[in-house]
Amino acid sequence: MANSPHGGVLKDLLAGDAPRHDELAAEAETLPAIVLSERQLCDLELIMNGGFSPLEGFMTQKDFDGVCENCRLADGHLFSMPITLDASQQVISDSNLKPGSRVTLRDFRDDRNLAILTIEEKEAKLVFGGDPEHPAIKYFNTKVEDFYIGGKIEAVNKLNHYDYVALRYSPAELRVHFDKLGWTRVVAFQTRNPMHRAHRELTVRAARARQANVLIHPVVGLTKPGDIDHFTRVRAYQALLPRYPNGMAVLGLLPLAMRMGGPREAIWHAIIRKNHGATHFIVGRDHAGPGKNSKGEEFYGPYDAQHAVEKYREELGIEVVEFQQVTYLPDTDEYKPKDEVPAGIKTLDISGTELRNRLRTGAHIPEWFSYPEVVKILLRESSPPRATQGFTIFLTGYMNSGKDAIARALQVTLNQQGGRSVTLLLGDTVRHELSSELGFSAEDRHTNVQRIAFVAGELTRAGAAVIAAPIAPYERSRKAAREAVSGLGGSFFLVHVNTPLEYCEKTDKRGIYAKARRGEIKGFTGVDDPYEAPENADLVVDVSKQSVRSIVHEIILMLESEGYFDRL
């Protein structure tokens, strides 16, 4: 029999509200609407299908405060992650939303009405401290709107999915599936990465020790920027399944938006798997860790997550399986947890960074590390040969610094090289074609650069070479552009055209600097608006000291050293 849900009752709102579907659907058409983002859709889906039981809606202030302060909902139930719905001041004002209002929650992808929220509270967004490099803090600072609105949900329609539909089990469906298979003890395994031989060995060990079966339950909602896309990962999981003994493992997909919250996230993940019927949950090394902070240090200790779930072991109601990192023993061709390996025994490991480098460069990945069928999928779909991958060259500098001339010359050189299409995004062209309505305020300049980054990222992902040459005077804009392109799997090279301002003015044949000095042009970079020199440029050049030809050659050499041209 499957594990009981967290709180004792599975809050399957879709099933509970089904008898009132026609009534709710009709009402939803008459109400003001909030169009949900991708992350909000992930949260709503797991509220409506019971994955977040005992929640029945988005948190109110008391629940939010209790969860943030001591991992407790207002009713005392353990819950470690705030689940909130944010909305802008404009949405609040336009729809006159206040406590007691009912509002439709709508899917941005197909404009379908999904649920009705009865607002219990509306509160201004709190201000949080924390390291700005943490994904959750970064999301909060850049994406979250002005207000939180909380209240109970009434389900109208389930979300439509068009990928891997047969693998998307709701908690109720997964419980029925376990019952059909006759499974009574289920070990759930959480992952946002491809699985390799070590993961197979770890999950089989856990199942063997507890006489259980395995639920491979990867996240296919929002994960960490730069992660391998879920389409590729699911194909890799499917290729791995036959490596388990027949009937031991099932693959199910979880539409979760991860927060990379380490210890708190581990507790949350355990609750979610309990709601899906699992009796055991694996928590490994650095569970849901976001990587390094702004000081280059890990946000959490490697086993902080294990300590957190151990603290609430009895209350969680799901047995947590704690594992050390496993390592390969070549002399016996087996994997063992590191704490079980005797001193002096030879071990082999490939780090995540090294694996990504090998995939990117096509270097050999040994069978002791991963299965050939998994590697084949990853190489073919997530890491094609470097010489066929796209990239973005982002030139930044003062107006008339020479970046446009460099960009045009580089475009010609890359076209002659062949092998990929080349797109040129000059600052003036983008301003005319994509951003004609924008001015030159700091926010408009930032928006302009983000539009360039969006276009560059999509083209780079498709295998093109993109040369962008805006002034891009602000560090935050350039950093966001790098993250946008890299987040889509593309390589981003920042070239600082560090031509001195005096030289730019002296060689300005159009007289634009002179107009700015006379006050005829306001907010001009270098005159009455600052240019923030890049902190982490991949290449620094100077047209006052170098020819355009030599600078283009430097860029080509940089690309060649990274493997972007065929090597015979």
UniProtKB/Swiss-Prot annotation:
Site, Transition state stabilizer: residue positions: H196, H199
Organism expressing this protein natively: Aspergillus terreus
Spans annotated as Allosteric regulation domain: 389-568
PANTHER family: SULFATE ADENYLYLTRANSFERASE
Signal peptide interval: none
Predominant location category: cytoplasm
Site (Induces change in substrate recognition on ATP binding): residue numbering on this chain: F323
Record-level GO cellular component terms: cytoplasm
GO molecular function: adenylylsulfate kinase activity; ATP binding; sulfate adenylyltransferase (ATP) activity
Residues involved in ATP binding: Q190, T191, R192, N193, G284, R285, D286, H287, V326
Sites where the protein binds sulfate: Q190, R192, A288
Pathway given in the UniProt record: Sulfur metabolism; hydrogen sulfide biosynthesis; sulfite from sulfate: step 1/3
Active site, per annotation: T191, R192, N193
Keyword Amino-acid biosynthesis: yes
Alphabetized InterPro entries for the sequence: APS_kinase (IPR002891), ATP-Sase_PUA-like_dom (IPR025980), P-loop_NTPase (IPR027417), PUA-like_sf (IPR015947), Rossmann-like_a/b/a_fold (IPR014729), Sulf_adenylyltr_euk (IPR027535), Sulf_AdTrans/APS_kinase (IPR050512), Sulfurylase_cat_dom (IPR024951)
Gene: met3
Quaternary structure and interacting proteins, as annotated: Homohexamer. Dimer of trimers.
Ways its activity is controlled: Allosterically inhibited by 3'-phosphoadenosine 5'-phosphosulfate (PAPS).
Enzyme Commission code(s) on record: 2.7.7.4
Protein family per UniProt: In the N-terminal section; belongs to the sulfate adenylyltransferase family. In the C-terminal section; belongs to the APS kinase family.
The protein, known as: Sulfate adenylyltransferase
Domain of life: Eukaryota
Subcellular location(s) per record: Cytoplasm
Annotated binding of 3'-phosphoadenylyl sulfate, by residue: D428, T429, V430, R431, R445, I471, A472, R510
Pfam family, one: ATP-sulfurylase
Reaction equation(s) it catalyzes: sulfate + ATP + H(+) = adenosine 5'-phosphosulfate + diphosphate
Residues covered by region (N-terminal): 1-162
UniProt function note: Catalyzes the first intracellular reaction of sulfate assimilation, forming adenosine-5'-phosphosulfate (APS) from inorganic sulfate and ATP. Plays an important role in sulfate activation as a component of the biosynthesis pathway of sulfur-containing amino acids.
